Curated annotation (Swiss-Prot):
Active site: 265
PANTHER family hit by this protein: UDP-3-O-ACYL-N-ACETYLGLUCOSAMINE DEACETYLASE 1, MITOCHONDRIAL-RELATED
Pathway: Glycolipid biosynthesis; lipid IV(A) biosynthesis; lipid IV(A) from (3R)-3-hydroxytetradecanoyl-[acyl-carrier-protein] and UDP-N-acetyl-alpha-D-glucosamine: step 2/6
Protein function: Catalyzes the hydrolysis of UDP-3-O-myristoyl-N-acetylglucosamine to form UDP-3-O-myristoylglucosamine and acetate, the committed step in lipid A biosynthesis.
Protein name: UDP-3-O-acyl-N-acetylglucosamine deacetylase
Gene: lpxC
GO biological process: lipid A biosynthetic process
Binding site for Zn(2+): 79, 238, 242
Listed EC numbers: 3.5.1.108
Sample GO molecular function, one term: metal ion binding
UniProt entry keywords in alphabetical sequence: Hydrolase, Lipid A biosynthesis, Lipid biosynthesis, Lipid metabolism, Metal-binding, Zinc
Catalytic activity reported: a UDP-3-O-[(3R)-3-hydroxyacyl]-N-acetyl-alpha-D-glucosamine + H2O = a UDP-3-O-[(3R)-3-hydroxyacyl]-alpha-D-glucosamine + acetate
Requisite cofactors: Zn(2+)
């Protein structure tokens, strides 16, 4: 059977919080089968846990943020969550000593590297997938996102930015998920923002950790980063990365096709909630044979460069 996975070792890293600009220590710990992904704030007493669950997401203004009834929060979870999805990790405790996950380089790549350092441990319990059984769609003005049945996990995402630096041909991406494909084609895409927005946010004491080291920054005409883009379609690729992280807030891999036009964290979360609220829209699935699995995860001992 396809089994659940956790980490082999505890791993730690430090980085800067995007909004606070302060140093954050991130610790990833192994967890037992059926624990799920749990985000934990260790700088409050007692520590506060947030299970990976669409209902934990209560703020999607500038990132995906988990917030509890007391207002305790962990922001910017989507890139790490995408890395967990990409590596097929079902169970882990994610500890931070701050109200946000460190931004690192603005992509999921540093988190993939961290997970590879930890190693993957298979557990003696079946991996449970969420299989989409019927179409579900959410619209917001001209933006929309939907799930349709599909024997795999496919992302079909289109953005529409009228900007000289964003080529019209590079605004749509169709990606058939596999761990290898995620690491090579998706994980290195960085978040992006406009200089005028960053300056405004910083005047409001937000985005204090924002810099050319952790984002693609644009003015009205061009990309301001000296090194340019990592690949031509880095903008839409990052939106796919965000969506993979947002959808993994379900706590389980999904078997289905996600289609979106100009979607963002809020719409992604609304769609996930709508699917899970409709008992006819999905079912649990497990797979006896790796060969028969519609979603390809990396072998636990395979190092993905």
């Amino acid at each position: 059977m396809i089994r659940q996975r956790t980490l082999k070792e505890i791993v730690k890293t430090t980085g800067v919080g995007l909004h606070s600009g302060r140093k954050v220590t991130l610790t990833l710990r192994p967890a037992a089968a059926n624990t799920g992904i749990i985000y934990r704030r260790t700088d409050v007493n007692p520590p506060v846990d947030f299970p990976a669950d669409p209902a934990s997401v209560r703020d999607t203004m500038l990132c995906t943020a988990l917030v509890n009834d007391q207002g305790v929060r962990i922001s910017t979870v989507e890139h790490l969550n995408a890395a967990l999805a990409g590596m097929g990790i079902d169970n882990a405790i994610i500890e931070v000593d701050a109200p946000e996950i460190p931004i690192m380089d603005g992509s999921a790549s540093p988190f993939v590297y961290l997970l590879q350092q930890a190693g993957i441990q298979t557990l003696n319990a079946p991996k449970r997938f969420i299989r989409i059984k019927k179409p579900v769609r959410i619209e917001d003005g001209d933006k929309w996102a939907e799930f349709v049945p599909f024997n795999g996990f496919r992302m079909d995402f289109e953005i529409e930015f009228n900007h000289p630096a964003i080529d019209g041909d590079d605004q749509r991406l169709v990606f058939d998920f596999s761990s290898q494909g995620f690491v090579k084609e998706i994980s290195r895409a960085r978040t992006f923002g406009f200089m005028r927005d960053i300056e405004y946010l910083q005047s409001q004491n937000l985005c204090l950790g924002g810099s050319f080291d952790c984002a693609i920054v644009l003015d009205d005409y061009r990309i301001l980063n000296e090194e340019g883009l990592r690949f031509d379609n880095e903008f839409v690729t990052h939106k796919v990365l965000d969506a993979i992280g947002d959808l993994y807030m379900a706590g389980h891999a999904i078997v289905g096709e996600f289609r979106a036009y100009k979607s963002g964290h809020g719409l992604n979360n609304q769609l996930l909630r709508a699917v899970l609220a409709d008992q006819e829209a999905w079912e649990w699935a497990t797979f006896e044979e790796e060969v028969g699995s519609p979603v390809a995860f990396a072998e636990p001992n395979m190092v993905l460069a």
